[in-house]
Amino acid sequence: SIIEKYMVAYNQEKPSKNTAIVVMNPKNGEILGMASYPQFDLNNPRNLANVYSEEQLASMSDTDVTNALYQLWTNYCVSESYEPGSTYKPFTIAAGLEEGVVHDGDTYECKGYEYVGPDMIKCHSYSTTGSHGVLTLSQALENSCNPYMINIAIKLGNVRFAQYEKMFGFGAKTGIDLPGEATGIMLSLIHISEP
């Protein structure tokens, strides 16, 4: 498939332990294509030679081989949980707009980082330009500005933010018609402290 072709090319250029690609119709959520790496041959599903060298295979215990096979057979698109990363930003903005803690014309000065408790969360601009400077809400989304989103989340507060996560379906199964679907990882309020 086209997806698998590009996935193999990507992994040759930037080797990874696993890769998951899902192509969806953004209008209705229909899955148009899906691929997972590493791949295995359905005609020879126990062949690990495409993933491990002869030396690596020779040094593996039976348990290691079994675990390697399970990893090889895993559909990483549905059976693993991943942090949503910047795809979370539109949901943060939507919650902020709905609750009135941010408005379309609002600006925020990105200094390149924001502290959440003791942790410094950097903006991707931190290593290049240091910061985005003053941004509108639209520019914050366009530039994927982490500090602006943190500012919105702080204004929402942990309880409201967690309520919106639940309303948007984060942490829940999608109901895809494939076996082994994992749920997302969500922290309960007891594990989240106010900044």
Residue ranges and their predicted role:
Residues 1-19:
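Conserved, well-ordered alpha-helix/loop/beta-strand core segments that scaffold catalytic motifs
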Residues 4, 194-195:
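Surface-exposed, proline-anchored Ser/Thr-rich loop/turn motifs
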Residues 19-21, 26-87, 91-193:
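Beta-lactam-recognizing serine transpeptidase/beta-lactamase-like catalytic domain environment
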